[in-house]
Amino acid sequence: MKEYVAGMTWGEGPRWQRGALWLSDTQGGKLWTDHDGPWRGIPLDAVPNGLWFLPDGRLVGAMMHQRRIGVWTGEQFDTYADLSAVATGPLGDMVGDPHGNLYVDDVGFAAHAGEPLRPGRLLRVAADGAVHVAAEDVEFPNGLAFVGDGRTLVVAETTRQRLTAFTVADDGALTDRRTYADLAHLIGDDVRPDGIWSTQDGVWVATTTGHAVALVRENELVTSIDTGTLLPIACCSDGGNRLFVTLADTHGLPLGEAMATKAVHTTVALLEVPKAGDTS
């Protein structure tokens, strides 16, 4: 594991597109990228959480507090879809399919503001901008990824310490809810899954307080990479054998205190992993 870039407060939603890395600093208020130049942070008035690239190559972000999907103009995120009439809490991570459907976390409560836990939901934004409730009673929904042939959607339920799977119907609806991986059982009680990324070898999971990046298959732990004192937040691959992982350093403080005082700092680490074809 080696450092790739640094400078962020809390790095979420890393995505690799056309030779460049993109990620959102949800606590630092910036969009970070090395697209068209050196690694830099672009200050934003409204910051996204999850990021994704549409089939036409446009970058979209889940604007966590404004409860909308924004499309990147090069300077700001203009509204792509308004979710404010449907969302019950801040927006979280996001993933899309080849048809232009987006699935996004409706977290249900503002964890960083100290609000009490409430069940969240998954929302589906169709290619025409229509918003649908795809799943109810998802507890602290976080990372999202398609696995296999794209007909299974996996979500990290942070406080339930597990990955939950749904079958994706032809119309985009989510059915057949089931446990994909019980991470507390497979890895340990300290696991709080955040971002995930899917490859042919399984699903990579950033476990935050579990201090590990783990590769799991359905009900199986394949491997786990210890991150020492650092907390892995999210991850993505470049489609080859490189896995990018955002790692938070709380400098010995409890995570909540470090977040509240902005004492946390994030780097991106680069892991060399066996090459596999991505299905995220």
Go through each PLM region and give its residues.
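Blade-level signature of beta-propeller repeat domains, shared across WD40, Kelch, NHL, RCC1
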Residues: C236-S280
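Beta-rich, blade/repeat-based domains predominating
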Residues: Y4-G19, L44-M63, R68, A85-L102, ...
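Flexible "stalk/tail and boundary" regions
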Residues: D34-W39, P55, L59, W72-E75, ...
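A short beta-strand motif characteristic of beta-propeller blades
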Residues: M1-V5, G37-P43, D78-S84, A130-E136, ...
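Loop/turn-rich, solvent-exposed surfaces of beta-rich toroidal or solenoidal domains
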Residues: Q161-R162, F166, D182-E220
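Short loop/turn segments immediately following beta-strands, especially the blade-tip
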Residues: F166-A173, V273-G277
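A short loop-to-beta-strand structural motif that recurs across blades of beta-propeller domains
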Residues: K30-W32, R68-G70, G120-L123, R162-T164, ...
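Short, solvent-exposed loop/turn segments at conserved positions within beta-propeller repeat blades
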Residues: T26-Q27, M64-H65, F109-G120, T158-Q161, ...
